[in-house]
From Swiss-Prot:
GO terms for cellular component: membrane. It comes from Penicillium rubens (strain ATCC 28089 / DSM 1075 / NRRL 1951 / Wisconsin 54-1255) (Penicillium chrysogenum). The indole alkaloid meleagrin was shown to be a good candidate to control c-Met-dependent breast cancer proliferation, migration and invasion. Its cofactor is heme. This is Cytochrome P450 monooxygenase roqO. It is a single-pass membrane protein.
Length: 503
């Protein structure tokens, strides 16, 4: 999923969080009609579009497929937060770097960014680009973070799953969320807070609470929103959570500043976005706490969603467990625990990418806002002010993916052996037929950290535990609105095993 769409939905527990965020990002603005597009869920006399919104909520996937079957390459959909334009993936390459389409403007003013407690995007030149810059810097440092991330995966997994050699039951959702939160916190704010229970609770729940607050505010007329948020309990709760985050984080940052200024400060200190952003600011005024909450918001829940889906697929196809385990043993026996070792886990990447192909976070991808009117090469015109997204349809194209509805864990492994397709097989590689991370200059910059975290989690699980779906029941897959999600109540039966190699 790209920069704009780093949130995915969850209608139980974690969920309402991300769903609302993506809705807010892309769907609130009205559609400007300078070209007529077919609307797939418009109805006569549906003045307030309530029927259309209900239809989208329950049948978005069918509406999109029906439009594509009719040969439509551009069409409208009414959602419960506005009307937007859906483009077929064939246009993604043409538009992927078009400066007239803005990822940032797809956020601006939509998710109440200027209300106190909700301003995770900030204002001003520094805040508008500091977080993506920090992520790009972190990507360059991932080679040095592998051991630290692995240590946190080991610690959390031992805490959650224990060393018991007897079969026992654990929650997939709770396990993965805790793992990703701890590992991501290690990369973002360093060792001091990555095992701090209170900070980890904030890292997991801030996005959820913020989304609930936005939903509560948006239930009021827009003219009252700048006032009503002061009185809504949900908004008050978010502001309290932010204040608590400041109380925890700022002393850590101050100690980091003092360490960095000491003459004996080690030059091989492990990277964190906390210190990077502080140095990047060069004394400019900025909100360090909100910067970290923003990074966390676009990282923890999305990565967790992806890993949960991969684990569910492996449980559906237990025949993959031994080949995956053998690959992990072979790679780490010969290469040790290094970032380059993770790149050699090609079967694991194939399983991850195939899972993501069939179960992306959202049905549609690459959310954008048109700053100017855009005319495509085939004459299709996108009016200025349009909020749009791509249909994510090529991921199920039988000409590109034989038997596209069937999960094939070896699909992208085989692709690596084809010289014409090998470069498109890696998990982090974007392409028009695989838009889960977006495509072009706004493709998700955090996908490299997400990939490394997912691999390390799977490596530790495969080496240290036997696991299977509880009573053979794999978490159900749900599609609601534009969001694709596994049931968060899924359980695993696990037991400790003797690993062949130690990470």
């Amino acid at each position: 999923m790209d920069v704009v769409a780093r949130f995915m939905v969850s209608y139980s527990g974690t969920a309402c969080a991300i769903s609302l965020f993506i809705f807010g990002i892309t769907l609130l603005f009205p559609f400007h009609k300078s070209q007529s597009f077919v609307c797939m869920n418009s109805h006569s006399w549906d003045i307030f579009r309530n029927k259309a919104k209900r239809e989208f909520e329950s049948n978005a996937e069918k509406l999109i497929k029906d439009a594509l079957r009719k040969g439509l390459t551009a069409f409208q959909l009414v959602t419960n937060m506005g009307t937007y334009l859906i483009l077929a993936d064939q246009y993604a390459e043409e538009l992927r770097n078009d400066k007239r389409l803005s990822a940032y403007d797809a956020l601006n003013d939509v998710i109440l960014l200027e209300l106190p407690g909700l301003e995770t995007m900030f204002q001003g030149s520094l805040h508008n680009h500091v977080s993506p810059t920090a992520i790009h810097a972190m990507n360059r440092e991932l080679v040095h973070l592998t051991r630290a991330l692995s240590d946190e995966a080991n610690h959390r997994l031992q805490t959650q799953w224990t060393d018991s050699s007897e079969w026992h039951t654990v929650s997939i959702h709770d396990t993965v969320l805790a793992l990703v939160a701890q590992m991501t916190t290690r990369a973002f704010v360093g060792a001091e807070l990555c095992r701090n229970a209170e900070w980890l609770d904030i890292a997991i729940n801030f996005t959820i609470n913020r989304a609930i607050a936005v939903q509560a505010v948006q239930a009021w007329p827009w003219i009252l929103q700048p006032v009503v948020h002061w009185f809504l309990p949900t908004c008050k709760a978010v502001r309290r959570q932010i204040q608590r985050a400041r109380t925890i984080l700022m002393p850590v940052l101050e100690r980091e500043r003092q360490t960095m200024h000491r003459k004996d400060s080690s030059s091989d200190r492990i990277f964190s976005t906390l210190t990077f952003i502080d140095q990047y600011a060069q004394g400019s005024r900025y909100d360090a706490t909100m910067a970290q909450l923003r990074l966390t918001a676009v990282s923890v829940l999305t990565t967790s969603d992806m890993v949960e889906k991969v684990l569910a697929r492996i449980c559906e196809h237990p025949e993959l467990i031994q080949p995956l385990r053998e690959e992990v043993v072979s790679v780490f026996e010969s290469s040790g625990l290094h970032h380059k070792s993770l790149l050699k886990l090609t079967l694991m990447e194939s399983v991850m990418k195939e899972s993501q192909r069939l179960e992306p976070a959202t049905l549609i991808s690459m959310f954008r806002a048109a700053k100017k009117t855009v005319t495509l090469q085939d004459g299709t015109t996108i009016p200025k002010g349009t909020r749009l997204a791509f249909a994510n349809d090529l991921r199920l194209d039988p000409e590109l993916y034989p038997d596209p509805e069937t999960f094939d864990g070896y699909r992208f492994e085989r692709m690596r052996k084809d010289p014409e397709q090998a470069k498109l097989a890696p998990f982090t590689k974007t392409r028009t037929s695989h838009l889960a991370f977006g495509h072009g200059k706004h493709a998700c910059p955090g996908r490299f950290l997400s990939c490394d975290e997912a691999k390390l989690i799977l490596c530790h699980i495969l080496l240290k535990y036997d696991f299977k779906a509880l009573d053979g029941r794999v978490p159900d897959l749900h599609v609601r609105s534009m969001f694709i999600q596994r049931d968060t109540g899924g359980m695993l039966s696990v037991r400790r095993r003797q690993e062949e190699v130690t990470l």
